[in-house]
Amino acid sequence: MWKEFKEFAMKGNVIDLAVGVIIGGAFGKIVTSLVNDVIMPLVGLLLGQMDFSNAFITLGKGDFATIAEAQAAKVPTLNYGLFINNVVDFLIIAFTIFIVIKQINRFNRKKEVKEEVAEEKATKPCPYCYVEIHKEATRCPHCTSVLESP
């Protein structure tokens, strides 16, 4: 059983997945920092010194300056600023993944076209019915004519 697990774990796909998860986690941290430390402070500056990370509405009694004060007083809060930060974070990650997948698909389409060209070169028309057949065929599958050996 250990041997089977070892073979499974050492397959290329599992290792590729592990590397992808690690890089994805690191990328997520970078994007979160970008949103929280660069983008949202600039947006807040444009909106009149607003700090989105501390934007909230209390759902109970009391007036609090920060989310931490409200939570310490056990007053429920609607933290819309943190939600906006997370939405921007998600949009950046989703757009980045979209661009990466789009490039991968574009690369795969080019590869498929090359394979199709190679397949086209592997065919020839039947001299009797003109249907495309494999270039090494000795009999046409469409009209069943016997062909000359290649």
Curated annotation (Swiss-Prot):
Keywords: Cell membrane, Ion channel, Ion transport, Membrane, Transmembrane, Transmembrane helix, Transport
Keyword field contains Mitochondrion: no
Residues passing through the membrane, by range: 14-34, 81-101
Keyword match Transcription: no
A GO MF term: mechanosensitive monoatomic ion channel activity
Example of a GO cellular component annotation carried by this entry: plasma membrane
Topology class, membrane: Multi-pass membrane protein
Subunit structure: Homopentamer.
Summary of the function given for this chain in its UniProt record: Channel that opens in response to stretch forces in the membrane lipid bilayer. May participate in the regulation of osmotic pressure changes within the cell.
PANTHER family attached to this UniProt entry: LARGE-CONDUCTANCE MECHANOSENSITIVE CHANNEL, MECHANOSENSITIVE CHANNEL MSCL
HAMAP family: MscL
Name of this chain's protein: Large-conductance mechanosensitive channel
Organism: Desulfitobacterium hafniense (strain Y51)
Gene: mscL
